[in-house]
Amino acid sequence: MKYSSLIIFLLKEHRIKTGIGFEAFGWYAVLISNPHEEPSKWKMQYIEGQETYGFIVGSSAVLKDEKYLYAYGAVEPATHEVYLLRWKLDEAYTGNLANPEWWINGKWAERKTLKPVPEPLFIGGTEYSVHYDSSLKKYIQIQSFGFGEGKIGIRMSDSLQGKWTEPFMFYTPEYPGVKSPFMYAAKAHPELPGKGIYITYNVNSFDFSELAENQTIYFPKFILMRIVKNDED
């Protein structure tokens, strides 16, 4: 069955007096019934996310197969444990995102209580990507690591649920001419054609005046990554 609607997951954020001044504390989704029209004409149904015990559903990757819609995310604030939730497509595309199934202890199950806290898939970040690479026959996860002048790393898995490899750091950005830089939100864009996988990341500054004045930052930076398959592994 073909589904013509579009589902977008949204973060709920509020101001705080520490750190970078805000944090995520919940999630919403919006169901757009006519996504092929101009955005100003979209018919949108906002769906308030249910209790997910600090897990921000859909803050990162969203995928689907023939039966289910899957959403990754991370526990906020700060701890970033990663889980995977799913809904039947028929339910998701009619706006029913209640009662998702969680991948917990090797099986799909509903989660009704905060404790016991399930084992996460891995420790991730608020924003990252997951996609399937048909040439490698692997799921690939890309994220930024570290808060500040960090690195970009990759994990791989045979399935959406894992087991995921340990992260491999493959790129360290440079920040010429940027005062007090920090890097975040690395993710892959497999939909872009090229001899490899295009990856974007963002650069910002802890110095607000630098953010306001430096027109080279706060725009996505692109790199091209090529993965060479090792037949012995």
What does each model-identified segment do?
Residues M1, V57-A61, T126-S129, F182-K187:
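Beta-propeller and closely related beta-sheet repeat lectin domains
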Residues K2-L6, L10-Y53, D65-Y68, G73-I123, ...:
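Beta-rich carbohydrate-recognition and catalytic domains
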Residues P190:
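Charged/polar, solvent-exposed surface patches and flexible loops
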